[in-house]
Each structure stands twice: as C-alpha cells, then as structure tokens.
From Swiss-Prot:
GO terms for biological process: rRNA processing. The gene is ybeY. It is an enzyme of class 3 (hydrolase). The lineage of its organism: Bacteria, Pseudomonadati, Chlorobiota, Chlorobiia, Chlorobiales. It comes from Chlorobium phaeobacteroides (strain BS1). Zn(2+) binds at H105, H109, D115. This is Endoribonuclease YbeY.
Amino acid sequence: MSLELYNTTKRVIPEEKLERVIRHVIEAEGFVPDVVVAVFCGDRLIQRINREHLGHDYATDTITFRYNSGREIEGEFYVSLDVIDKNSRRFKTGFENELFRVAIHSALHLAGYDDSGDEARAGMKKREDRYLSQLPSL
C-alpha cells in the first residue's frame, strides 16, 4: 500500500493531513490505495498534462488517471495550486478548504465516481461535503 504526495511548488501545504484525508476517502469508499501518487503543482504543468492527455489547452483544478480496475487502486492525480488559489478567492472559501475539496474530489475520481452530468455532479458534491465535514477529526 503506497500513497505518495509530491509538491512541485514553493507553496507550503499540509501534506500529512492531505495524505490522511486522501487515504480515508479511498478506504471509506471500499478501496485500497495500492499505488496512488498525488502531485500538487502549478498551472503550467497541469495545463501541459491537460493538453497532452485530454486535448484541452487550459489549466484546470485536477486531472485524475486510474490505471486499473478492482478494489486496489493504482492511479495518480494532479492538482493545480494556482487554480485552487484563484477558486478559493473567487468562491470565498479559503485556500485550505478548497485544497481539501479538490483532493477529496480527486480521490473520489480514483474510486470510480464521475462528475459528467448534473446528477453525477450533484452526487459527487454530496460526497465531497460529507468528507469535508469529517476534516476536523482526521
């Protein structure tokens, strides 16, 4: 079981708590983080990944790749701290709250949840909110 976090930016983030939260979400959804890599980066890297792998030439908050199926998750996700910062100011949520929301969102993608379509998006948001409410105890 391996969960690795990498911060490619100069910004300080709560890596230990992020690791606990990501692991908690994956396990609470009935999965095991066999090999999971979380990369916290800037706009330039996530835009390049978005362009090369998804054909979208813009920065986004997160991109998730799942490499297998079954209960043991092998995958990775990228989170743009630049987009997190912009969105936290735009939605007046605070940087850390937005960071944890997107990390939870990414973990849910690894667990197989999709957010394409209104109903799926609403279901994912409900799960995100539930896990966000658990943050103080994690």
